Amino acid sequence: MVGIVVVSHSNKLAEEIINFAKVLQQEDFEIKNGGDVKNEVYGTNIDNVKDAIIEADQGEGVLVFVDMGSSVFNANQAIESLKGKINAQIADAPLVEGVISAVAANFDDISLEELKIIAEESRNFKKSKK
């Protein structure tokens, strides 16, 4: 199964997104918080993201979700440092909708690439007809 990592500047936000998404989880795969889970601080760093990717990997790759700014930079750096060891990619998707879509679709041996497409399609969800 594809692992999933959520990287947010707020650990509490990432944890709540993960808790909510787990309600839709159909298979056994890892969903990890890539933030600084040991401290109640805001921000991200490369080491925490890298550790979360390693923990989430079950051999089929890891899809990483980020909120903004340094989370994007740190996730890219962490992925680069793991190149050749773990296939990890960032989903260019809204954080909440993307994670929920990916968790709900992560079953039946879906590939990392297929899951990324599904997550990124969440950018097109309309919340209003106006």
Model-derived features with residue positions:
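N-terminal loops that bind phosphate or other acidic moieties
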Residues: 2-130
